[in-house]
C-alpha cells in the first residue's frame, strides 16, 4: 500500500510502499479516506531535536484521519464493516493506575499513532477497536479528519466553566482558534485571542471570536478597556508555548483566575511566580483528549451548530502531499487536508 513515511534521518517525508498492517484479534482495519497534517507531523518533517529523539526511522507518520472499517478482529464487538470512524491517537496500556481508574488519557505507558507505531498517512491503518470512534452521519469527512486536534481544543476549553466568563486564548494556531470558538459557542462573554501571525488572526475573526489581537501592533490592556473589562480575564487558555504570551496571560488574569496549558514552552521558561501565588491562580496542564468524553463532546458541539469549516483552508490529493506540507510550514494556513480517495 502507499504510505507517507519518514525514511531518512533528515528533513523531508517520502511516499513509499509498505505492507498492509496485520489485523489483531482486538483491532480494526481502517481504509483511510482523508488525513490532516498536524504540527507534530511538521516537526517530524523538519527533523527537529524532539523528532530526532522520538521517531524511529523508517516510520509511517500521521494521526489525524477519517476512514471506513474494512476489517474486524475476532474479539471486537460494537463495530461493523462500513462504519465511518476516526480514532484516538494515544494507545494506552489498560493496566496502570490511571487506566484502571478511568483517567485513561493520563496513561504513563501511552504509545502515539504515527509517532511510536505506524500512523494513518497510508491507505490502511490498524488500531485497537477501543480507540476507534464512530462518526455521526451528519458530520463531514473533512471535519471528522480533524477530530484529533479539535479534541485538544475541546479538552482545553472545557476544563473550566466558561459561561459568562472572559476568556484569553494565547496562540492562534488551528487548535487555539478552535478552542476560542468552543469557548464562545458554549457561552463565554468575551473571548480574546492573541498572536503575531496576521493570517491566522484573520481566520480567528472568521470564527466569530470577540477580538483577535495582534500583540505586535495592539496593547492587550487597551483591548480589555475597550471591552469594559475592569478586573482581568477569568479563564486563560495557553496554546502557544511562547514564554512572552504566558507572562502576559499572568499579568492580565483576574485574581482567582484559572489557566489551562496545552502549549509546550521551553523547559527552562521563567515566570514571576508571585503573580501565581498572590493572585491565587489555578494552572492545569492538558494532555491529549479525555477518553472518550471529549470525543462525544466534539460530535455534540458540531451537531449543535459550532462551525469549524473556516479553519480548513487547504485541500490536496495525497499525490500532492508536498504542497500540503509546504502550506503548513509556511504559517499561512489553517488545517490542511490530504485526500486518499
Curated annotation (Swiss-Prot):
One of its GO terms (biological process) is L-threonine catabolic process to glycine. Belongs to the zinc-containing alcohol dehydrogenase family. The active site is at residues 40, 43. Keywords: Cytoplasm, Metal-binding, NAD, Oxidoreductase, Zinc. Zn(2+) 1 binds at residues 38, 63-64. Zn(2+) 2 binds at residues 93, 96, 99, 107. Its EC number is 1.1.1.103. HAMAP family: Thr_dehydrog. The lineage of its organism: Bacteria, Pseudomonadati, Pseudomonadota, Gammaproteobacteria, Enterobacterales. Gene3D superfamilies: Medium-chain alcohol dehydrogenases, catalytic domain, NAD(P)-binding Rossmann-like Domain. Homotetramer. Its cofactor is Zn(2+). NAD(+) binds at residues 175, 195, 200, 262-264, 286-287. It comes from Shigella sonnei (strain Ss046). Pathway: Amino-acid degradation; L-threonine degradation via oxydo-reductase pathway; glycine from L-threonine: step 1/2. Binds 2 Zn(2+) ions per subunit. GO terms for cellular component: cytoplasm. This is L-threonine 3-dehydrogenase. The record marks 148 as: Important for catalytic activity for the proton relay mechanism but does not participate directly in the coordination of zinc atom. Catalyzes the NAD(+)-dependent oxidation of L-threonine to 2-amino-3-ketobutyrate. SUPFAM superfamilies: GroES-like, NAD(P)-binding Rossmann-fold domains.
Amino acid at each position: 500500500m502507499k504510505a507517507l513515511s519518514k525514511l531518512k534521518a533528515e528533513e523531508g517525508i517520502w511516499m513509499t510502499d509498505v505492507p498492509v498492517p496485520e489485523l489483531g484479534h482486538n483491532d480494526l482495519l481502517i481504509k483511510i479516506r482523508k488525513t490532516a497534517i498536524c504540527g507534530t507531523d511538521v516537526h517530524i518533517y523538519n527533523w527537529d531535536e524532539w523528532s530526532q529523539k522520538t521517531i524511529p526511522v523508517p516510520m509511517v507518520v500521521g494521526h489525524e484521519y477519517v476512514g471506513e472499517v474494512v476489517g474486524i478482529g475476532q474479539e471486537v464487538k460494537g463495530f461493523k464493516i462500513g462504519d465511518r470512524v476516526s480514532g484516538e491517537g494515544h494507545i494506552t496500556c489498560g493496566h496502570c493506575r490511571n487506566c484502571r481508574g478511568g483517567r485513561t488519557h493520563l496513561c504513563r505507558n501511552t504509545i502515539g499513532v504515527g509517532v511510536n507505531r505506524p500512523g494513518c498517512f497510508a491507505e490502511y491503518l490498524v488500531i485497537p477497536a477501543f480507540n476507534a470512534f464512530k462518526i455521526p452521519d451528519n458530520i463531514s469527512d473533512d471535519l471528522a479528519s480533524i477530530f484529533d486536534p479539535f479534541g485538544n481544543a475541546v479538552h482545553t476549553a472545557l476544563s473550566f466553566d466558561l459561561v459568562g466568563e472572559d476568556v484569553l486564548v494565547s496562540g492562534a494556531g488551528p487548535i487555539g482558534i478552535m478552542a476560542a470558538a468552543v469557548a464562545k459557542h458554549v457561552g463565554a462573554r468575551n473571548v480574546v485571542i492573541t498572536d503575531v501571525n496576521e493570517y491566522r488572526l484573520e481566520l480567528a475573526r472568521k470564527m466569530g471570536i470577540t477580538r483577535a489581537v495582534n500583540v505586535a501592533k495592539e496593547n492587550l490592556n487597551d483591548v480589555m478597556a475597550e471591552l469594559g473589562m475592569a478586573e482581568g480575564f477569568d479563564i486563560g487558555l495557553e496554546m502557544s508555548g511562547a514564554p512572552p504570551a504566558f507572562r502576559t496571560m499572568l499579568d492580565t488574569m483576574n485574581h482567582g483566575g484559572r489557566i489551562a496549558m496545552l502549549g509546550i514552552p521551553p523547559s527552562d521558561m521563567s515566570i514571576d511566580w508571585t503573580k501565581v501565588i498572590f493572585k491565587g491562580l489555578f494552572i492545569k496542564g492538558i494532555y491529549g483528549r479525555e477518553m472518550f468524553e471529549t470525543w462525544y463532546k466534539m460530535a455534540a458541539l458540531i451537531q449543535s451548530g459550532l462551525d469549524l469549516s473556516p479553519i480548513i483552508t487547504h485541500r490536496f490529493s495525497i499525490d500532492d502531499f508536498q504542497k500540503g506540507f509546504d502550506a503548513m510550514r509556511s504559517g499561512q494556513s489553517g488545517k490542511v487536508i490530504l485526500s486518499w480517495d
